[in-house]
């Protein structure tokens, strides 16, 4: 069966997310490039790049959409107990490039979409103030973290990694707590999976997600939300 997709041109325009295919879920367009301004334009419309080895750049806007509500996120009792015992240090925006690299290198080469071109694009977005990371440290070594794109009061999570037990879960927990205190309203996780569901993610259909996106992208978090800072000191 033939699939007809829009090919992106030199402008940063995208087709409507409502034109995305249902199978494969959310596939919307192909081509273009990974210019940071194009990527950011996509996020502001609920569209993100994802493609595998040997494929053109593919752009997606799936439905339903997996999300977290920072205001209602609750870490499990076992996770809180783990953190009390191990006291991982948690920071924000102190090692974004390293986090992006580890999100790629900690996965088998044939299982990651985060190739060198994608890494470079998100590092550029970090330099422009749009891509942010949460880092988890143990004995001054980076052992877990996540990164994503800020779109007003929406945070679009991209990837996470964990080199020690629960490190990525702790990154998510502290991100939620931090965003909740800084007027952050929603975390987009793109597509649901069992791991996200176990942490409390829930789904929004396309209409509801786009409505929230259109509202939240026009609002701002506190001015110091993504200032490099310590969220949890290892000795606190």
UniProtKB/Swiss-Prot annotation:
The organism's place on the tree of life at top rank: Bacteria
Q: Which principal EC class is assigned to this enzyme?
A: transferase
Q: One Pfam family this chain carries?
A: Leu_Phe_trans
Catalytic reaction(s) noted: N-terminal L-lysyl-[protein] + L-leucyl-tRNA(Leu) = N-terminal L-leucyl-L-lysyl-[protein] + tRNA(Leu) + H(+); N-terminal L-arginyl-[protein] + L-leucyl-tRNA(Leu) = N-terminal L-leucyl-L-arginyl-[protein] + tRNA(Leu) + H(+); L-phenylalanyl-tRNA(Phe) + an N-terminal L-alpha-aminoacyl-[protein] = an N-terminal L-phenylalanyl-L-alpha-aminoacyl-[protein] + tRNA(Phe)
Gene transcribed to yield this protein: aat
**Isomerase as UniProt keyword:** no
Establish whether keyword Acyltransferase is in the entry: yes
State the family named in the UniProt similarity comment for this chain.
Answer: Belongs to the L/F-transferase family.
Q: What is this protein called?
A: Leucyl/phenylalanyl-tRNA--protein transferase
Q: Name one GO cellular component term.
A: cytoplasm
Q: Which cysteines are joined by disulfide bonds?
A: none
Query: Which Gene3D superfamilies does this entry report, sorted A to Z?
Result: Leucyl/phenylalanyl-tRNA-protein transferase, C-terminal domain, Leucyl/phenylalanyl-tRNA-protein transferase, N-terminal domain
Tell me, what is an example of a GO biological process annotation in this record?
protein catabolic process
Q: Which InterPro entries match?
A: Acyl_CoA_acyltransferase (IPR016181), Leu/Phe-tRNA_Trfase (IPR004616), Leu/Phe-tRNA_Trfase_C (IPR042203), Leu/Phe-tRNA_Trfase_N (IPR042221)
Compartments in which it is found: Cytoplasm
Q: What is its main location?
A: cytoplasm
A single MF term (Gene Ontology) = leucyl-tRNA--protein transferase activity
């Amino acid at each position: 069966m033939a699939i007809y997709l829009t090919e992106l041109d030199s402008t940063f325009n995208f087709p409507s997310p409502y034109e995305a295919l249902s199978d494969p879920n959310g596939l919307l367009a192909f081509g273009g490039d990974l210019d940071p301004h194009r990527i950011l334009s996509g996020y502001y419309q609920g569209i993100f790049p994802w493609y595998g080895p040997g494929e053109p750049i593919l752009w997606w806007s799936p439905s339903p959409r997996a999300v977290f509500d920072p205001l209602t996120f609750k870490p499990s009792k076992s996770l809180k107990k783990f953190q009390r015992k191990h006291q991982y240090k948690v920071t924000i925006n102190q090692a974004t490039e390293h986090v992006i690299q580890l999100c790629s290198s900690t996965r088998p080469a044939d299982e990651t979409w985060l190739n060198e071109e994608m890494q470079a694009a998100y590092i550029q977005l970090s330099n422009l103030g749009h891509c942010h990371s949460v880092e988890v440290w143990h004995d001054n070594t980076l052992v877990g973290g996540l990164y994503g794109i800020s779109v007003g009061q929406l945070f679009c999570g991209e990837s996470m990694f964990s080199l020690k037990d629960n490190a990525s879960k702790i990154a998510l927990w502290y991100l939620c707590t931090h965003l909740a205190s800084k007027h952050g309203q929603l975390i987009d996780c793109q597509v649901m999976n069992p791991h996200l569901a176990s942490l409390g993610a829930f789904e929004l259909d396309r209409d509801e997600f786009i409505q929230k996106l259109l509202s939240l992208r026009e609002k701002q978090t506190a001015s110091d939300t993504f200032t490099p800072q310590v969220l949890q000191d290892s000795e606190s």
